[in-house]
Structure formats: C-alpha cells, structure tokens
Amino acid sequence: MRKKLLVILLLLVVLIVLVVTRCGGKKDQQNDPADGQGFAQQSGKAELPAELKLGVVTEAESGAMQLEVERNGEKTVYVFSDITINDWYVPAVNYVVTNGLMSGTDVGGGLSLFRPNYGMTRAQLAMILYRFAGGEPVAAPRHTYGDVSSGEWYYDCVNWADTNGYIKPESPDSFGVEAYCSCEEVLAVLHRLAGSPESNASLEDYPYAPKVSETNLSAVRWAWEKGLIAEDECVWYPTQAVSRAQIALLLMRYDQLIGASGEAA
C-alpha cells in the first residue's frame, strides 16, 4: 500500500513540475496562431527612451492615458479612452503621437481612440514611413498599379515607398494597399530603410525562428541583432498581422537605436 502511495505521489510531483514549466515557458505565452488572427500581449512594459522627443503623459480621471503634446508653441491634449496608464505600449504611443507619426481617431467629447490592437494596412504603413523618414513626393511613379489611384490620401506615400524600394508590391499589377502587414514584412521594410545591412545573428533564442520566411530571414536577423524585437516579449510572430501598438514600438526603437537617417555606427 505504501509503495502504491509513493508511486502516486511521485507521479503527482512530476505532473506539477511539467505544468509549472509549461506555464512559465516562453512558447506557451503565445500559441501558434493562424496567420493574421489576433495579437499576443507583451509581458513587459516598453522602455521609455529619455533622449527622444516625447510628450507629457498623465492619467485622466477615467483612468485613460492623457497625453499633452507641444508643437510650434501650441499644446494639444489627447485622451485615449482605449489605453490605460499601465498598458505596456504607453511610451510607444507617446512617441508616435508626439512626433506626428500616428494620432488615432477623435470620437468627440475630448476623447480619442488609438486602437492599439488593430492591424495596419500597407497603405497606412507607407504613410507612416513617409512621415518617419521625411519623404517627399516623387516626380513620377516608378510603376502604375491597379489599386493605387491618383488623388487618394495614400498616393504620394505609396509611390514614394515603392520608388525607393522600401515596400515591395504584392504583384506586378497590385501594390496591395488594403492588405494587412505581417510582423516580418514590417521588419523587412525597416531593414530596407536602414540600407539592408548584412546580419549573421543567431536566431537560436527567437521562439518563432522556424516560421520566418527565407525572403525575410536577413531582415529578422538584423532586427533581432539590433534589439528591435526581443525574446522575452513573446509577441513577434513572423507571419501574424502586426498591431498598431507593435508598429509604434518598432518605430520608437528604430529611432532610438538606429535613427531615421540609416544604419547606426
């Protein structure tokens, strides 16, 4: 009887150890999601780089993020009702809003929605990259695409991104303005913006390395080496649609670590 009890106790101990190990393991923090479905949450809070241009963040009475931005001597106050003061992406939202890269939607009553967990289309990414890199309208489009129409809000931005080779078209006839950006696609865009530097960094500690496409492998290696993505965050699934909050964080880190002018020394 005692032997049976001892065996049962040993089995229970092994089972508990396995459960605890799995719950604490980085691969369990984000299951293998269907591409483009949902966004994993970041485990830590983004660091706030003091040397970047930032606004003043306070907590509104409702508990929402309140951001005061000063531009050209005028102050603007944003209250993002869909962001709480403790959300991990608050520093990144501060950065992109203060620097005029992203803003959100005014919903009236002094409130705005940033929609941090929404995806981003390729046209939206082109517009933000255009602002980030200080782009200028090109004299003539490099190529004409069936889904890029003159007069659309994204026209100059898409033509600039296409002409400079930062964002690749989906096909010879379609730029793919309405398609949502994946994580590895955005990393590839930033890699090209930096001049496509070589990187042989190991992705051994990157949980989703086997999921990275061969086309974007060099870009992901570079992003990993530079610290644009980090192993302990468990949110950078290569083929998953990237969120607005994630893009805000990538832009903040790029500016801090590399700078919009190109590759860091």
Description of each model-found segment:
Residues 1-5:
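Positively charged n-region of N-terminal signal peptides that target proteins for export
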